[in-house]
Amino acid sequence: MWKKVAMVALFFMISALLSMPGGAVEKDYGKHPWVVNIEDMTVKNEYFRAAKWTGQYLQMTVMSLKPGEEIGLEKHDQGDQFIRVEKGNARVVMGLSKDKMTFDKKVSDDWAIFIPSGFWHNIINEGDKPLKVYVIYAPPEHPAGTLHRTSKESEAVHGH
């Protein structure tokens, strides 16, 4: 009898954890084969940044930016970056100098952004709803398992 009660309780606890914002996004599945519905996972994510898969040469994170929030002006000298907008409206700016952004485009659902190594860039949520994106870095940019619940938490770690 008690075993049955314990199993039911365990089932409900696991269900509750998986139904939390973003589903169990705290886990990084890297270094193991993994298959995922990337759109569903990205749209459900409510954290500013969560590393979902970190391998030796590649990393995938999901991000959620509140209206008016931005990723922050940054540059990666050691690798390229790919960003896909799953949901929302954003402005993308890029340039070889942080003082001279020569690339300025508006993007929305289903758009892809390719950022070459050495380019300063920023993504700004210009919509009135959260911007949901996934990001692929080659090589990895963040430590495996990185989780930034808010942009302020990310700024404290990265300075942007």
Predicted regions and their residues:
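Sec-dependent N-terminal signal peptides
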Residues: V5-M13
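Short hydrophobic/aromatic-rich beta-strand segments that constitute the beta-sheet cores
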Residues: M60-V62, V92-M94, V133
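A short, N-terminal "cap"/entry segment at the start of jelly-roll beta-barrel domains
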Residues: W2-A6, L18-T61, G72, D104-D109, ...
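A generic "binding-loop/recognition-motif" signal
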Residues: L58, P67, Q78, F119-W120, ...
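Histidine-centered metal-chelating micro-motifs
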Residues: E70-G72, R91, W111-I113, S117-I123
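Ligand-binding loop in jelly-roll beta-barrel domains
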Residues: D109, S117-P143
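Glycine- and acidic-residue-biased ligand/ion/polar-headgroup-sensing regions
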Residues: Q78-R91, G95-L96
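Short acidic-glycine-tyrosine-enriched beta hairpin
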Residues: S97-S117
